[in-house]
Each structure stands twice: as C-alpha cells, then as structure tokens.
Amino acid sequence: MPVLSIIACKMLEDELTRVLSLDATLRHLILVDNLDGMGLSRKLRAQNRSHLLIDRDEIPDRIKDLQKDDFGKFMKPLLKGFHIIRGRASENASAQEHIVVVNVLRMALHSDGKLIKDEVYKNVRDMSRFSDGILLLYGLCGNSLGDIGNDLRDLSCPIYFLTDRDDKRVDDCIAVALGGNKRYEETLRGFPEVGFFFTPMWAFNWREIEKEANNSSKSQSLGSMLNSLGYQKVAMLDTGLHYTEDFGVESKVGEFASLYNLEIVRLQGSTEIVDRCYQQAKEGKFNRKHSGL
C-alpha cells in the first residue's frame, strides 16, 4: 500500500480540506498531530472525513501496521485456490489503496525565506523515509523553494509540485487561488492599485499576519505599509471554499480595509490547481522525479 505524504502551507488548509474530503477512494488518512494541523482536523471532521491524529514519531509504525493488514487481505483470497491467483492479483493491484499522511507547517514561516526553506527541506527529508511520494503544497515562496528539486535529488521518492496548466511551478498561494502564474500576472496588471490579496485563510488570519510583520525587521504593520506605498485597494478572492469558520472573509477583509481606509475589490478564485495536482500525485502521473520546473 503506497504512501503519499503531503507537506502543506497552513494558508492552503481549505484547498486541502476540499481534496481530502471529496476523495471517495481514500480510506487511510493520517494527520501529524501538531498545533498547526488542528484547524485542518476540525474542518475534516465537519465534512465527516475520518482521519487519525498521530504523533510524528509514531507514524512509521502505524503505516507498517496498515500495510501488514492490507497484505493479509491481499493474500487471503489467493491462498484459496491456485486457479484464481492471476485474476485476483490483477484485481487487487488495480484497486490498490493509498495511505495519505499530511503535515501542516506553521504559518509564521512566511516571515523569513531562510526559515521556510530550512523547515520545508527538513520535513521533506524526514517524511521521505516512509513515503513513496511527497506532494509539496507550497509555491516558490519568493523563490525560497525554487531549487528544492535539485537540492534534494538524492531522495528515494519523488516530490510533486503545485503547477499551473503550463506545467510551471506556481509562485505562491495567491497564484494557486487565482489559477496559475499567468492569471496572477494578468490580475496584477489589471488591478495595479491592489496591494494585497485575501483568500479566506489569509483573511481569517490577518491579525496574525500583522503581528508577524511587527515582530520582523519591518517597522510597519501590513496595513501601514500598504498605505505608505500608495496602495488604495485590497482584493478578496472567492475560491468557493467556505470551510473557514463564518467564512469571515467579508467581515475580516472589511475590518482590515476599514482600519486602513482601503477599498475592496472582489475577484473570482479557483481550486483547480490543488485539485489536479493532488490527483496527479496520488496516481503517480508525474514521472519526472524531483523536477525543479
């Protein structure tokens, strides 16, 4: 039973909730038991998606137990009669189940390019030990993760990336929400007065973003920085996902915009990239091991 691990940015929690809750073939879902995964766990429970919360150090043993049980189910019908071995083996191979292991990393990583690189690399190496493939739910993130394919080419399992329809890795989570780099560039050109894009998760966590900005080397809060740079608007991206409590986007974005005297632009988002890349990683369609594209 192959293992697909997902290392995810907390800002893509809603997109991850969608693909995991809609995957009717997924029977074994494990979440790394940490504080940053609690939001995803709550949303999955609300969607009646069963899953296990397991301490990181215990996950390899739990995977072995699941694989052992699966092997027993596979062998039992084969031992009933030699004449059915070929048919049964083929049937079981085509219906082979996956184990999906999800590790949500802390949002504060966004404040420092070196920090995000170090943490993601560490977790990819760590989880590769028990994985047959790793789906990285991060964009390039200011190119902090641009060389990960080459840097970790010694791994024993492939890394799958979030890519747009041109097969290029997406810049960041906003490019993911807009449907790709091309649409992102078009939006930036079409709305030059927009200084920040709010997805539901960014909206829900904007006060924490402000706190991060204040604690970093920046002397200004996010809103004050937008004001000083002359931006007059912020964008609210509606991806159609309403897993975030209250979908606080309208009230949260309105709260932020009012505080800094900014207008709100409403834009249509998309879940296409995460939907497609999750399915492709699960099916192993990308045979380009460790692609750095």
Q: Which residue stretches match the model-derived regions?
A:
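A conserved mid-domain beta-alpha-beta active-site/ligand-binding segment of alpha/beta enzyme cores
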Residues: 184-252
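Extended, basic/helix-rich recognition subdomains
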Residues: 222-293
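Hydrophobic beta-strand segments of well-ordered beta-sheets in folded domains
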Residues: 2-6, 99-100, 133-135, 158-159, ...
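Long, charge-dense
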Residues: 103-106, 145-208
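Short, well-structured alpha-helical segments in soluble
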Residues: 118-130
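Gly/Ser/Thr-rich loops at beta-strand to alpha-helix junctions
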Residues: 6-14, 109-114, 134-147, 166-168, ...
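Short, solvent-exposed amphipathic alpha-helical segments in soluble enzyme
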Residues: 20-26, 151-154, 250-257
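N-terminal glycine-rich anion-binding loop in soluble enzyme alpha/beta folds
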Residues: 2-110
